[in-house]
Design a protein with these regions (language model features):
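N-terminal juxtadomain amphipathic helix
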Residues: 1-66, 223
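Conserved class I S-adenosyl-L-methionine
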Residues: 83-92
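A conserved beta-strand element that flanks and buttresses the S-adenosyl-L-methionine
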Residues: 148
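A short glycine-rich, Lys/Arg-flanked "PGG" loop and its adjoining helix->strand segment in the class I
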Residues: 160-175
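Conserved SAM-binding loop of SAM-dependent methyltransferases across substrates and taxa
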Residues: 93-106
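Short, glycine-/aromatic-enriched active-site segment of Class I SAM-dependent methyltransferases
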Residues: 178-201, 205-207, 212
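Conserved SAM-binding strand-loop segment of SAM-dependent methyltransferases
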Residues: 124-138
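Flexible, glycine-/basic-rich loop-and-beta segments that form/coincide
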Residues: 228-267
Length: 267
């Protein structure tokens, strides 16, 4: 049974930049209320149509210098994996894939699948194939040695369609590197500003383990990062080509004990 967890009233879309105070005051506002279910899946009550959120998307990853540094560091975590073909989902202006290419001594086939048309030319100029579409299993893509999605999965109301796409496009022995603001840290530190309309889900490990299992996937490794107020990086593989590691166990225990309603009351 879903229960209201955090209600922040109504809010405008955060990536709209207004020229005047009056424009801002007249902006359309949408409900900003979230629920939690028995599996600790937290999501917004209201999903804003993707066309309103992303067709004229103003945010550029490259202006976020801590994120650029984060991308450069990520290469050192994954370079030991097979990495001939890498697909980045929601790769924006190509910041992550550019960081990989600049540090790799091997030729890389790099593909950015992004719903916004705003970044096509910038990616193509960098030698990155750009697929202007939502990540889905109907796309014609080569099997990926690595799929990356950094600060993207929580933006996706169609989480199960996303997982079906991972299952199809990830090579048998490939690894999906998933990053998201870790919601346990969000509540521990009362970061209410993580709640906005682009973030439809607020992920914990508990519901993800169940979702991954449904699509034949499992967590094989975890790393915590400081970016975005506390990010969890999960390494995910096909169950058919990986062994259980217990990597998620400590997170499952911590989430079961935590008082999310008490923290929400203090936000």
């Amino acid at each position: 049974m879903d229960k209201t967890l955090l209600d922040l009233g109504t809010q405008p879309l955060v990536n709209n930049l207004f020229h005047t105070k009056q424009e801002a005051l007249n902006a359309t506002q949408y409900p900003m209320s979230s629920t939690i279910d028995n599996d600790l899946k937290i999501q917004l009550d209201t999903a804003i149509p993707s066309e309103e959120l992303y067709m004229k998307y103003l945010y550029h990853s490259a202006v976020n210098k801590p994120y650029v540094y984060h991308c450069q560091k990520m290469w050192h975590s994954i370079k030991h994996l097979k990495h001939n073909t890498i697909i980045d989902v929601g790769g924006n202006d190509g910041t992550l894939l550019k960081a990989f290419r600049s540090q790799s001594t091997d030729p890389l086939k790099l593909i950015n699948v992004d719903a916004s048309a705003s970044f096509r030319e910038e990616n193509l100029e960098a030698g990155i194939e750009y697929i202007n579409d939502y990540f889905n299993e109907d796309l014609e893509l080569p099997k990926a040695d690595i799929i990356t999605s950094t600060n993207v999965f929580q933006h996706t109301p169609g989480a199960e369609k996303f997982l079906a796409a991972v299952r199809k496009h990830l090579a048998d022995t490939g690894v999906w590197v998933l990053e998201f603001p870790y919601t346990l840290r969000t509540f521990e530190t009362l970061q209410f500003d993580q709640f906005y309309h682009e973030h439809y889900y607020y992920w914990l490990v508990t519901p993800l383990v169940k979702l991954f299992d449904k699509y034949g996937l499992r967590i094989i490794n975890t790393e915590e990062q400081t970016i975005h107020g506390g990010t969890l990086r999960l390494w995910i593989a096909h169950k058919s080509h990986s062994n259980p590691t217990g990597a998620a166990d400590e997170y499952l225990k911590a989430e079961k004990k935590f008082d999310f309603f008490g923290a929400a009351d203090r936000m």
